[in-house]
């Protein structure tokens, strides 16, 4: 299956003038993530990649490798946890970990000194590592989104379509062998 087909199985764009997200939407997100090849799915609350605000509800099942990347300095992004927990690793240019943000939904908030919300306003390489069976978060980023311009992948990390064992080994290395679920 080519990358474009996988992408179509992992996202939907909202075409309504107003949209709310409730319990049934979360249930549907999980069902769609379960069906997708990479066990992830997103509802884009914006109607296209051209919208000036890119706003998504993202669902990840289990460990999911989201290659370290950064955005141009004009782009800021934030994550707000809805369910589960995740860690965001920030890197320097060489791939050395410079900071770790531990995030969790309200039901996990007292565990391991986790926060609800994270925001990145600089062009810094970052990696998201899900920490629970289901990780669901609200992401907001400056648009419009053009993958060739809006995302620069880190050369120091394996590509997203690498052998899954290679992704696991890389994440074990940067997390000191801790990619286990909470």
Q: Where do the protein language model's features map onto the residues?
A:
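Conserved short histidine dyad/triad with adjacent acidic residue
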Residues: 57-75
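Conserved hydrophobic/aromatic beta-strand scaffold that supports enzyme active sites
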Residues: 57-59, 78, 117-119
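Histidine-centered metal-chelating micro-motifs
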Residues: 65-67, 87, 107-128, 145
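Double-stranded beta-helix
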Residues: 94-102, 107-112, 127, 131-182
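Short glycine/proline-enriched turns and hinge-like loops at secondary-structure junctions
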Residues: 71-72, 80, 130-133
């Amino acid at each position: 299956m080519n990358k474009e087909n996988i992408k179509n199985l992992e996202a939907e764009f909202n075409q309504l003038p107003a949209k709310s997200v409730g319990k049934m939407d979360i249930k549907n997100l999980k069902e769609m993530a379960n069906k997708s090849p990479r066990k992830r799915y997103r509802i884009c609350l914006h109607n296209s990649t051209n919208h000036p605000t890119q706003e998504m509800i993202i669902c990840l099942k289990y460990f999911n490798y989201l290659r370290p990347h950064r955005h141009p300095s004009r782009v800021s992004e934030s994550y707000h946890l809805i369910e589960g927990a995740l860690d965001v690793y920030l890197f320097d240019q060489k791939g050395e970990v410079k900071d770790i943000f531990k995030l969790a939904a309200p039901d996990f908030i007292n565990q391991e000194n986790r926060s609800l919300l994270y925001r990145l306003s600089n062009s810094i390489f970052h990696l998201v590592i899900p920490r629970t069976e289901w990780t669901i978060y609200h992401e907001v980023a400056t648009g419009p989104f053009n993958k060739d311009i809006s995302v620069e992948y880190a050369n120091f990390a394996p590509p997203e379509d690498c052998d899954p064992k290679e992704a696991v080994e890389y994440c074990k290395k940067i997390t000191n062998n801790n990619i286990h679920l909470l």
